[in-house]
């Protein structure tokens, strides 16, 4: 497999993932973006584990979908993420649901 084949494979997988996102976004209430991943989830709980210049955040998601083109199954019953970087949690508008 050469570089062009790999680029084409990744582009095709990314397009499939974008289509899957469009198909499933209506099943979820929240969009969650961490420094490493993007998730859709129905329940989100964020806790601050330590304060300071770099606070540690614990994010627990239930009934989630993860944007990851290398996973066979992107539906996950429970996710726990620890982060000390940016975290974005958005409640999806009802019109998008």
Regions found by a protein language model. Give the residues of each.
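Conserved RNA-binding domains used in RNP assembly and mRNA/RNA metabolism
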Residues: 2-97
């Amino acid at each position: 497999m050469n570089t062009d084949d790999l680029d084409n494979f990744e582009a095709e997988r990314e397009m499939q993932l974008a289509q899957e996102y469009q198909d499933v976004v209506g099943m979820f209430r929240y969009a969650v973006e961490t420094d490493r991943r993007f998730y859709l989830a129905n329940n989100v709980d964020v806790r601050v584990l330590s304060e300071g210049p770099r606070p540690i955040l614990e994010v627990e998601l239930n009934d989630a979908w993860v944007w990851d083109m290398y996973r066979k199954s992107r539906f996950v019953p429970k996710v726990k993420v620890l982060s000390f970087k940016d975290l974005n949690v958005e409640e999806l508008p009802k019109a998008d649901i």
